[in-house]
Design a protein with these regions (language model features):
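Conserved donor sugar-nucleotide recognition element shared by glycan-biosynthetic enzymes
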Residues: 1, 26, 141
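C-terminal alpha-helical cap/extension of soluble enzyme domains
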Residues: 87, 98-187
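Catalytic alpha/beta core domains of metabolic enzymes, predominantly
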Residues: 7-14, 22-128
Length: 187
């Protein structure tokens, strides 16, 4: 990855935010590559979606090298643990649907309010278990999120091929889950 970054970064017209998602890319940024990326002013941070707290802790261990370099986490189920460990925040799918929940969780973790973190994290887990587990495939996360956003009137649930939106039985289950969650998550 270092050779790739050495070649790519000088050609970019905009700053680069690294995205570590080995489940999809089949590669992961090595620690030395991340440390060297911190020295490159055009690389401005990293989002980690590896689902590994061990990997994230190793990345966070590099922050003394460049404390202003943002490290974000992708899986919302890890947001509170990541922020408590020193991450700067997250880019979480469920925040598109319930933004206040994720902001409150971030703020509670940042403040070290562990009782509030536990309470809010349990709600995030209900979102995850309820919306992202409908269907059989790994696409269930995006289908669940887009379907819930569509049912909430925020966007259409159409997806790029080969993915397809949920059919009526899955949409009905999604509606049921939304009806259960929404009163818990909205003021």
């Amino acid at each position: 990855m270092q050779d790739y970054l050495d070649h790519l970064v000088p050609e970019l017209p905009l700053p680069l935010f690294l995205y570590n998602m080995p489940a999809l890319t089949k590669v992961s940024f090595e620690m030395e590559t991340v440390r060297r990326a911190m020295d490159e002013p055009r690389i401005i941070g990293l989002k980690d979606s590896s689902c590994s707290m061990i990997y994230l802790h190793r990345i966070l261990g590099l922050l003394p090298h460049r404390p202003d370099w943002p490290v974000l986490v992708g899986p919302e189920e890890m947001l509170s643990d990541a922020v408590l460990a020193g991450a700067h925040g997250g880019v979480n799918g469920g925040a598109n649907l319930f933004p206040r929940l994720y902001v409150r969780l971030f703020e509670a973790a940042r403040a070290g309010d562990l009782a509030r973190v536990r309470e809010l994290h349990s709600l995030v887990m209900r979102v995850s278990e309820g919306l992202y587990r409908i269907g059989k495939h790994s696409s269930a996360i995006i289908k669940g999120l887009k379907g819930a956003l569509a049912l909430s009137g925020i966007c259409d649930d159409g997806m790029a091929e080969p993915f397809q939106r949920f059919r009526d039985p899955e949409r009905a289950r999604l509606r049921q889950v939304l009806d259960e969650l929404t009163p818990l998550l909205t003021p």
